[in-house]
Design a protein with these regions (language model features):
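N-terminal entrance/gating region of PLP-dependent enzymes' catalytic architecture
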Residues: 1-120
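Conserved C-terminal alpha-helix-loop-beta "cap" of PLP-dependent enzymes
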Residues: 45-49, 183, 187, 194-196, ...
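Glycine- and acidic
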Residues: 82-90, 116-124, 163-165, 189-193, ...
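Buried hydrophobic packing segments
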Residues: 99, 103-106, 132-141, 178, ...
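Structured alpha-helical segments in the cores of large, soluble enzyme domains
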Residues: 99-106, 174-179, 202-210, 327-334, ...
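Conserved PLP-enzyme active-site core in the AAT-like
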Residues: 124-312, 317-320
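Short, solvent-exposed loop/turn segments at the edges of secondary structure
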Residues: 276-278, 291-294, 333, 381, ...
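PLP-dependent aminotransferase class I/II
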Residues: 291, 324-340
Length: 434
């Protein structure tokens, strides 16, 4: 007992010591086991801060696609909502109002039909575009299952015909979350191969891969690799033509990056709900939505595109609450931040910011191409990034360095511009996006 008392008194005395004079600072803390005793707040903070100090500076990370700065007023509002669970709308009704208003604003921005606008807008906030894509993909899969069930119930249908495996058509340059969706939800991924002339979706080849078990086609508005906008107009026309063959194939637009760019930088571009076969769109608020991570959005054309199986109602928190997200609890801060940005910037503000980004892209493209060392892979119409690769050496000589070496040298100077390999069908090409 005396030993325990002495130990407690020693710990109490240590609380008065300067941070770097305390014993805990010198103790090795591997994190392999749960700590037996706690630390003073100042020591715990210092240990965490010191370990993070070796990380890259987010503002010098030129390839993360993530917002790294917000106004002080936005940060204040988000900090005030740190302890709020957004799912508890009975206790925090303002957060659900903000979310619904953001969905309605996005439905308007994406030209949803009258039945999917205002209070009728169909969508939800998510923790990122991955969750939004899972929801969009699940909606397409369930709708496909419902169509297949109706076909089996028709007079003369072959009741003994085995059920086919659902498949999803997408280019090889999709983000990894699409691979996860197919793996998690038992969907066959059908990848349209990329090549040096098709860095994004080859629409003609995609249409040729569609069959009666295709739940939908993914069109990317802003490729992770090169920033390309895929040709959603051609995709829409193609799946429309397939209806004459009895094939009903919806389009989901992966607008993780581009859905917050195209409406402002390229307002005449056709890609959204103006096209009749686009049924759902995801967007990342923490990318060009200009909010700190993580927040994403899923917006459907209207509620008829949302299967009832996706909607759950619970009364855990004191009232009957409908939910269409995969994740249950989530912080309210990012929703508050997104609503602030929509109010603060409006169309005019977002247009000005996207125009500035496009000008920066043009400037960097000209400077990088002007060195004569690089081939530009990104397009004029697309995400405001510059994707490039080293030109082959003249005379067939072997180069002593590659894009990964270039990325390492930039990292030595404090800049994060990671190089990565292009989709597997494109051989011997790497692209550092900037």
């Amino acid at each position: 007992m005396a030993g325990e008392l002495e130990g407690a008194m020693a710990r109490a005395r240590s609380f008065a010591l300067p941070t770097f004079a305390q014993r805990a600072i010198a103790d090795a803390r591997s994190g392999d086991a749960f700590p037996a005793a706690g630390l003073t707040a100042q020591v715990a903070r210092q240990l965490v801060r010191d370990e993070r100090s070796a990380d890259a500076n987010p503002k010098r990370n030129l390839a993360s696609f993530v917002t790294t700065w917000m106004e002080e007023e936005a940060v204040d509002l988000m900090q005030e909502a740190l302890d709020v669970n957004a799912v508890d709308e009975d206790e925090y009704p303002s957060v659900r109002k903000f979310e619904n208003r953001c969905v309605a604003m996005l439905a308007d921005l994406f030209h949803a039909p009258d039945g999917g606008r205002g209070a009728k807008a169909a969508g939800a906030a998510t923790v990122g575009s991955s969750e939004a894509i899972f929801l969009g993909g699940l909606a397409m899969k369930i709708k496909w299952e419902e169509r297949q069930a109706k076909k089996r119930d028709q007079p003369g249908a072959d009741a003994g015909k085995p059920r086919g495996t659902p498949n999803l058509i997408m280019a090889g340059n999709v983000q990894v979350c699409w691979e996860k969706f197919c793996a998690y939800f038992d969907v066959e991924p059908r990848y349209v191969p990329n090549d040096a002339d098709h860095l994004c979706l080859n629409v003609e080849r995609a249409l040729g891969m569609i069959d009666e078990n295709t739940i939908g086609v993914c069109g990317i508005l802003g490729s992770t690799y090169t920033g390309h906008f895929e040709d959603i107009v051609a995709l829409d026309a193609g799946v429309e033509a397939l209806k004459s063959k009895g094939l009903e194939v919806p389009i989901h637009v992966d607008g993780a990056s581009g859905a917050f760019i195209a409406p402002f930088a390229f307002p005449d571009l056709q890609w959204d709900f103006k096209l009749k076969n686009v049924v759902s769109i995801n967007a990342s608020g923490h990318k060009y939505g200009l909010v700190y991570p993580g927040i994403g959005w899923i917006v459907w054309r209207d509620w008829s595109m949302v299967p009832k199986k996706l909607i759950f109602t619970t009364n855990y928190l004191g009232a009957d609450l409908p939910s269409i997200t995969i994740n249950f609890s989530k912080g309210a801060s990012q929703i508050v931040g997104q609503y602030y940005q929509f109010l603060r910037l409006g169309r005019e503000g977002y247009t000005a910011i996207m125009s500035n980004l496009q000008r920066t892209k043009t400037f960097l493209t000209e400077k990088i191409a002007g060195t004569g060392c690089f081939r530009i892979l990104s397009a004029d119409v697309g995400v405001p990034l510059v994707a490039f690769c080293l030109k082959p050496p003249e005379g067939g000589e072997r180069r002593s360095f590659d894009e990964f070496d270039l990325a390492d040298k930039l990292r030595e100077r404090g800049w994060v511009v990671p190089a990565y390999s292009m989709p597997k069908d494109i051989k011997n090409m790497c692209a550092p996006p900037l």
